[in-house]
Structure formats: structure tokens, C-alpha cells
Amino acid sequence: MTTRTATSTSTTVHGHLGDLKLRNAAITGPHLQPKAAKQDLADTKPDSARTFPGLGFKLSPTEERLRAKRNWGFLETAYDNSKVMGLTTHFVTITMAIVFNKSWLAKPVYDWLNTYDRFTIHTVHTWILLSTCQLLVIGLFALTDLSGRPSWLARYRMQPHKPPTLAQYKKLIPVVLFNLVVVNTISNIIYYPLAEWRGIQTTYETLPSGKKLVAQWLVCLLMEDIGFYTVHRALHHPRIYKYIHKKHHEFSAPIAGASTYAHPLEHYFSNLVPILVGLLITRAHISVQYLFFTGLMIGSHVQHSGYNIPFLTCALVHDWHHYFNTENYGPVGLLDAIFKTNKTFKAWTSETVAAFHGDRAKARQAALEKLAQIEAEEQERIR
């Protein structure tokens, strides 16, 4: 197989062909990638002044220069949120869980929960909690997307020139509801006997300590990254992609509801199974199960929202994946770092952030050096 290497960056070409060439350059390495969808390639065509939607604010000179070359990530404020800042959501939800478990409310709540049989706890109650959380998050983003309010949020969009539409929401609702009602229910039913086999506890008396809860959460997060990365990258194989994962990539500029806009098999094996594996390995208490599920549910929808809002889950990484249809396969980024499936993304963002700091020449040189290093590594691998 002939390997294509990254030999250029978007700063060396004119117009939106910069996006296209960088997208092609990103499709490298020993893994095969599908051809970009037609609607993705169409995104590289420059918008005329007449068709370009009003953003409600003026672009800075640097943003205008980037906008002239790129269709993704040309707003400076979209980079205000970092992956470290994005951990705030997890910190808050974990803290709330620990505080609640130590509060006077915990015993009556868990005692009430256990008035139901264990099948109901693991299936019905879990489904109600996750469904409520998912629909609430989708609903909040839908109100923002369709009303345009609060208007300041538009400043945090990675692709502000492609505002969400009512037609998109109408398109995804049937698929999202099917996965929510049918696939999630089947998943809970399959999970129940496995949870019984592993002896997963649900009572107040068996609540984990704060340290144990955090430790189990971290193991679950690691298993989620390993499982999701593996399945997701496999789904990008061209022999599989068009049958399953292509559906999810119909949204090159994703919206929150697109998180579970996926083929049922993908939703189960990619979105759900990696989470369940971690819970089973750690024999996590039902409280950890609820915490982990809801935290990931919020994070996944924020990652697909199109907004990189400070102190919410960082959405830059996954929004890049949807636009360029390559790299950034994992939700955490650990395996992407190990297998270097984030190298073009890192070169791009390093160049862009440097440009916003006023040193465009240095930014361009840094990007060229990074891509030259990538090319050298690929040539060495071929030898």
C-alpha cells in the first residue's frame, strides 16, 4: 500500500483548498481512511458575501485572514476552552456524587431505590435517568441553536458559518429516539445478568468511599477510551465505513443531538459497550454507574454541540474529526497520543493559536516543521 504523507499545510495554499489539502494530508499512516463524503468536500468551496450567514459580530483581522483560507476553527474565542478547563464538568459531577453519598439524603434515596427489584434498578431506573439527562442536554442546545440566543455563544462555534437548522433536528430525531428507546433498553437488559454475575451493589451500606469512587471512575474512563477508540477507528475502515459509520458523519458540522445519531450497531458497540466493560471490571456501585453514565452523556453531547464553551467538555478535538473525517478517534485522547492519530490536528491548532498571538511567521514555520517531522516519520516507517 502506498502511504500518503503530509507535505503541506493550509498556510501554503490559497482559498479553502487549504482545508482540502490538509484533510488529505491527515489521511496518512498504516490505517486506511474512507474518502471524504461529498458534502464534506463541498464545504471547501468559499462562501460568497451573499450566501455567508451573518454572525452577529465582526471578525478580527487575524480571524478574517484565517477565514479566507479555512472553513474550520477561524474564531479566536473557540480556542478559549482547553482540555484541562474541560475537566471542570467531571470535577463538578464527581464532587456532587461524593457529597451526596455522604449527606443525610443518601440513605433514604438508596433505601427507596432498593424497594424495587434489581432488574428494575438496572434497566428501568437507569434508562429513565439517562434518557432524562440526554433529552435535557439536547433540548438546551436545540433552544440555543434554533433561537440564536444567547447570541454570545456564537463566538464559541468552530464552524459559525454553518448554523444548525430545524431541518437537521427533524432529520436526527427519529434516529436518536430509536437508539434511546430500543437500543438503550436492549443494552440494559443484556447488562443486567452481567451485573448480577459481577455482584454489583446498589445499597446505601455498600456505598464506596470517595477514594474508591474516584479510582473506579478513572478505570472506567480508561476502558472507555480504549474501547471507543478501537471500535471507532475500525469503523473508519473503508470496507466498513459506508455501511455503518458514514451515517454518523452526515453531520460535518455536528450538533448536540448528533452524538447518538448513529447506526444501531455503532451506538451499541461504540457508545455503550466500552462504558459497560469498565463498570463490570471494577464492579462499580450503582452510584458510580449513574455518575459515569450521566457524565459521559453530558460530555459526548457537548463534544458534538459545535460550541467550545469554556469550562465545558472541550469540543475542538471531536469537531475537527467530524469536519476532516480523520484523526482524533478517542474521547479522552490517550490512545490518539500513543498511536499518533492526532498529529495533524496538533500541528493545525499550534499554528492557529500562534497566529492569534500575533506571530504569524513563527506560526507558519512551526507548522511546516511539525508537518516535515510527520513526513520524515512516515518515510522511516515505509523503509
Curated annotation (Swiss-Prot):
Keywords: Glycoprotein, Membrane, Oxidoreductase, Transmembrane, Transmembrane helix. One of its GO terms (biological process) is ergosterol biosynthetic process. It comes from the Eukaryota. It is an enzyme of class 1 (oxidoreductase). Residues 217-341 form the Fatty acid hydroxylase domain. One of its GO terms (molecular function) is iron ion binding. Glycans are attached at residue 342. It is found in: Membrane. It is a multi-pass membrane protein. The chain crosses the membrane at residues 84-104, 123-143, 172-192, 214-236. The keyword Transmembrane helix applies. Induction: Expression is strongly induced under conditions of nitrogen starvation. Expression is positively regulated by the cluster-specific transcription factor rua1 that recognizes and binds to the specific 5'-T/G-G/T-C-G-C-A-T-A/T-C/T-C/T-G/A-3' upstream activating sequence found in all promoters of the UA biosynthesis genes. Its EC number is 1.-.-.-. Pathway: Secondary metabolite biosynthesis. One of its GO terms (cellular component) is endoplasmic reticulum membrane. Disruption phenotype: Leads to the production of UA derivatives that lack the alpha-hydroxyl group. Fatty acid hydroxylase; part of the gene cluster that mediates the biosynthesis of the glycolipid biosurfactant ustilagic acid (UA). UA is a secreted cellobiose glycolipid that is toxic for many microorganisms and confers biocontrol activity to U.maydis. UA consists of 15,16-dihydroxypalmitic or 2,15,16-trihydroxypalmitic acid, which is O-glycosidically linked to cellobiose at its terminal hydroxyl group. In addition, the cellobiose moiety is acetylated and acylated with a short-chain hydroxy fatty acid. Belongs to the sterol desaturase family. This is Fatty acid hydroxylase ahd1. It comes from Mycosarcoma maydis. The gene is ahd1.
